[in-house]
Amino acid sequence: MKYQDLLAIAGCIANAGAVSVSGAAEGFAKGVTGGGSATAVYPSTTAELVSYLGDSEARVIVLTKTFDFTGTEGTTTATGCAPWGTASACQLAINQNNWCTNYEPNAPSVSVTYDNAGILGITVKSNKSLIGSGSSGVIKGKGLRIVSGASNIIIQNIAITDINPKYVWGGDAITIDNADMVWIDHVTTARIGRQHLVLGTSASNRVTISNNYFNGVSSYSATCDGYHYWGIYLDGSNDLVTMKGNYIYHFSGRSPKVQGNTLLHAVNNYWYDSSGHAFEIGSGGYVLAEGNVFQNIDTIVQSPVDGQLFTSPDSNTNKVCSTYLGHVCQVNGFGSSGTFSQADTGFLSNFAGKNIASASAYTAVQSTVPSSAGQGKI
């Protein structure tokens, strides 16, 4: 065997041993294993990445470069609409499923040209771990779709960027719908047309969203101010969602919107710099928020709250949590932010017997989360 061949084999063995899932999921998706101990594969083309994610094998898929889907499926020029005006900083809307026609009939019609690859994400099937190597694993121009019964999936240490950011309905970064046991960890999302994360109307069951950096800075937004509106939308029919340690930055709304039948434990997250609101809680949204920091968030929760909300308002009230979560809830911290005080307790029994993420005092969040959330921070 040639010396060069031996070096290549040694390099592959080193790579396979060097990259693996870091840590373990806390909260509702505790126990998720993804691709488990499967031999790591290293896709080199967009087609190979799509194939690995969409097959029936248990896989550990390692990204070592940028996979740019821009232009891979062509572009479409069509008539859309401008619901928020035609100023240069305003998002335009694609007339997807006749949205402009049905919901914005009075909005000006405009020509839109968008990249087809962004509209629908890459299908991710069961028993997959998708891992980035260092800070080099990027999916550009296309998101991920965990749907149709997919389960036991880990997405860790990657970035998803640049999905038709000018256009509403241009595509989502991560879609979860009709799934179970999904862990999204240390992912960075930026410059997305629609939702950075969406859990659709079917049951997504047990999901943990941890240590991610949702970056809402954009040249285009529905509020025409550079603050992305479409952040995180949790709309499932039977969803248990843990959000812990996330950095949610520069949004003007829906960060998150919670409704359907969704139990959300929002713990030790850092919201920073919003031109609108953070939480929007619709019917069927049940939110417990503890140990978070809200900095420069004028409207923490949009009125009215049509679901139920426990904001962990004070140490005495928070004692009720110990019965159902196994710990006294932590108060939240605020800086230059609006009010956030509601103590609905009727839904707290829904946490009983579940896997619950631990909670730290909010004082540790501001100094640690921005520097530890997102890709390359493991």
From Swiss-Prot:
The active site is at residue 254. SUPFAM superfamilies: Pectin lyase-like. One of its GO terms (biological process) is pectin catabolic process. It catalyses: Eliminative cleavage of (1->4)-alpha-D-galacturonan methyl ester to give oligosaccharides with 4-deoxy-6-O-methyl-alpha-D-galact-4-enuronosyl groups at their non-reducing ends. One of its GO terms (molecular function) is pectin lyase activity. It is an enzyme of class 4 (lyase). InterPro entries: Pec_lyase, Pectin_lyas_fold, Pectin_lyase_fold/virulence, PEL. It holds the Pfam family Pectate_lyase_4. Residues 1-18 form the signal peptide. One of its GO terms (cellular component) is extracellular region. Disulfide bonds join 81-100, 90-224, 321-329. Its EC number is 4.2.2.10. Gene3D superfamilies: Single-stranded right-handed beta-helix, Pectin lyase-like. It is found in: Secreted. SMART domains: Amb_all (SM00656). Glycans are attached at residue 127. Keywords: Carbohydrate metabolism, Cell wall biogenesis/degradation, Disulfide bond, Glycoprotein, Lyase, Polysaccharide degradation, Secreted, Signal. Belongs to the polysaccharide lyase 1 family. Pectinolytic enzymes consist of four classes of enzymes: pectin lyase, polygalacturonase, pectin methylesterase and rhamnogalacturonase. Among pectinolytic enzymes, pectin lyase is the most important in depolymerization of pectin, since it cleaves internal glycosidic bonds of highly methylated pectins. This is Probable pectin lyase B. It comes from Aspergillus fumigatus (strain ATCC MYA-4609 / CBS 101355 / FGSC A1100 / Af293). The gene is pelB.
